């Protein structure tokens, strides 16, 4: 991230040893006090933020919890741990890939990964790496490829295998 701060007078710290990110259902989030059904809406729970996922509320809410308070927060929220694979499967079904994307690095623009639809691109502010290309693609309405979810009805698909729709 330090590469992207340009000349801003900010410090970026790695706090991954102090905090953990967890997810709860949208229904559980809306059952908490002072919540709203708005993507990105944030509340504080014991000083830690809980927010409705800004990419899609179907993903539920995200919690950023201090590791020292994790067990107590889970208990107070009446949560039970689940297999994170379920979360990633739901994410992929919604067209929001989060794992297994390493091969796409430097080969695809954010706009081709649906970042605009996922509230990840703002065409009104700031500059960022790839902004010129992204703006040109948007302006000319020329998205030549797009990352989309699909359901395999029969069989299995191998990496780099061609996929056809109605033999085309």
How would you label these PLM feature ranges?
Residues 1-168:
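Basic, glycine/lysine-rich polyanion-binding surfaces/domains
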């Amino acid at each position: 991230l330090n590469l992207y701060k340009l000349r801003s007078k900010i410090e970026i710290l790695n706090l991954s040893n102090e905090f953990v990110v967890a997810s709860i259902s949208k229904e559980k989030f809306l059952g908490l006090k002072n919540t709203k059904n708005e993507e990105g809406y944030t509340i504080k729970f014991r000083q830690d933020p809980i927010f409705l996922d800004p990419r899609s509320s179907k993903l539920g809410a995200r919690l950023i919890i201090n590791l020292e308070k994790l067990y107590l927060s889970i208990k107070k929220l009446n949560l039970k741990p689940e297999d994170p694979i379920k979360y990633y499967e739901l994410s992929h079904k919604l067209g929001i890939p989060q794992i297994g994307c390493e091969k796409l690095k430097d080969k695809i623009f954010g706009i081709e990964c649906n970042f605009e639809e996922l509230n990840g691109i703002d065409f009104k502010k700031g500059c960022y790496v790839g902004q010129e290309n992204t703006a040109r693609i948007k302006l000319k309405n020329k998205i030549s490829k797009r990352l989309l979810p699909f359901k395999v009805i029969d069989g299995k698909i191998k990496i780099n295998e061609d996929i056809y729709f109605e033999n085309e």
